[in-house]
């Protein structure tokens, strides 16, 4: 059975044509992208590296990493999102290899192939996030980097990421997130340990409503990113 929720897939497939509109439903991803890209590159030095972007959607992060000189493969289970990603890659002239395949299936086919694996804003949308973390460990080379980003599960994250972002500020479509699937840092850390990955860094991302910009922070109470390594 594929580790995917059909409702979640349909939700993002229905919005696929909006991926590259910086003022539409995926505006927060466009605003987040420079911050997460800079953070990933600071750790992994992307130029010349083989990179896998799991849950790549329309390719916002995939193209950005390729633009820094990485050899990027993006995978997703949304046919529509991948179609948009392929088309935008042709238009932009940035080469990314896209494929519709589950992370677990690719892990069985291409173990220890990638220098860097990214899985951003994806874990909170799947039924078994621990299985994705395990697949990431299998896919990355010994000594390589794995990066995750997701949402913490607490009252503040519910108020900010669901009520605030979806219903008040309307930064995201209603129903984008299922609070029950948010993942506490301690839970993600346990998935990482179980997969024999080593946590190297954790950073929060906060939104300033006055400047309307995201920034890195020590505050992991809502959005956060985790950098891990597979030991040699």
UniProtKB/Swiss-Prot annotation:
It is an enzyme of class 2 (transferase). Pathway: Cofactor biosynthesis; ubiquinone biosynthesis. SUPFAM superfamilies: S-adenosyl-L-methionine-dependent methyltransferases. The keyword Cell inner membrane does not apply. Pfam families: Methyltransf_23. It comes from the Bacteria. Belongs to the methyltransferase superfamily. UbiG/COQ3 family. O-methyltransferase that catalyzes the 2 O-methylation steps in the ubiquinone biosynthetic pathway. This is Ubiquinone biosynthesis O-methyltransferase. It comes from Paraburkholderia phytofirmans (strain DSM 17436 / LMG 22146 / PsJN). The gene is ubiG.
